[in-house]
Regions:
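Hydrophobic alpha-helical membrane-insertion segments, chiefly the h-region
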Residues: 15-24
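Short, exposed beta-strand-loop hairpins at the edges of beta-sheets
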Residues: 103-111, 186-204
């Protein structure tokens, strides 16, 4: 009887320790991940996750103008190539995008660049977007739109569908038709589609 009781107690203790160990193992659901944090950077090359916290940022030059690049770690990611600054129609005053761990960021010719975390996104927007990478349903409402560049501006406008059966869009918006630019396009934006605007500080959307 004493031997049976001893075996039973050992089993109970072992089970309790096992449950305790299981309960404190971190899981993906309760793990804390780093949040986007404001930072100012000087010309050079940086790695997201080492020099910049991963997250969504609006990037602006604090003074001057120059080149801003980003190169995604994953081949499926989108790259950025903008001239940040003001005072020239080919410059953009800011660019907004997600920066993921392992992505490379490079600045040239700009004394200082400010990364400001995006804290709010306007899913009900139906009117305007600037340079950067945007998601339908998070930054603009889904629907049919007529899309036009801001006054006197030109640049690339692309839409990558979320669905493999969706249609992509790749146009150069602008008034110079002799250079292959188009002054307006009609686009159907579906939830989850990704929009990229390059070289333009403003693109106008008119819901149809």
């Amino acid at each position: 009887m004493k031997r049976a009781l001893h075996v039973f107690l050992v089993g109970v203790v072992g089970l309790s320790l096992g449950l305790l160990a299981f309960s404190i193992v971190p899981t993906k659901n309760n793990a804390v991940s780093a949040k986007a944090t404001a930072v100012a950077l000087q010309p050079g090359e940086y790695t997201v996750g080492a020099d910049i916290n991963p997250g969504r940022y609006t990037v602006t030059p604090q003074n001057g103008s120059g080149n801003f690049y980003s190169d995604p770690k994953k081949s499926s990611g989108s790259s950025l190539n903008e001239v940040l600054g003001t005072g020239d129609p080919t410059y953009v005053p800011s660019v907004t995008a997600n920066f993921k761990k392992g992505d490379k960021v490079k600045m040239e010719g700009i004394p200082s660049v400010q990364f400001t975390p995006v804290t709010k996104r306007n899913k009900n927007n139906t009117t305007m977007l600037g340079a950067g990478i945007w998601v339908v349903g998070k930054d603009i409402k889904k629907g049919k739109y007529q899309v036009t560049p801001g006054q006197g501006q030109s640049g690339n406008f692309t839409v990558e569908p979320k669905s493999m059966f969706g249609s992509s869009t790749n146009e150069i918006l602008g008034d110079d038709t002799s250079a292959g630019q188009v002054p307006k396009i009609n686009a159907t934006l579906r939830k989850g589609d990704t929009i990229q605007i390059q070289g333009m500080s403003q693109v106008n959307f008119s819901k149809k």
